[in-house]
Amino acid sequence: SDAVADGVHAISGVVDS
């Protein structure tokens, strides 16, 4: 997972695997 996706998911409350 890239930094941008991780940031968005963190804000959304979703953790990408």
Curated annotation (Swiss-Prot):
| Family to which the UniProt record says this protein belongs | Belongs to the Frog skin active peptide (FSAP) family. Septenin subfamily.
Could you list this entry's UniProt keywords, alphabetically sorted.
Answer: Secreted
Any one cellular-component term (Gene Ontology): extracellular region
List localization entries: Secreted
Q: What does this protein do?
A: May act as an antimicrobial peptide.
Keyword hit for Secreted: yes
Transport recorded as keyword: no
Q: What is this protein called?
A: Septenin 1c
UniProt note on tissues of expression: Expressed in skin glands.
Q: Please state the protein's primary subcellular location.
A: secreted
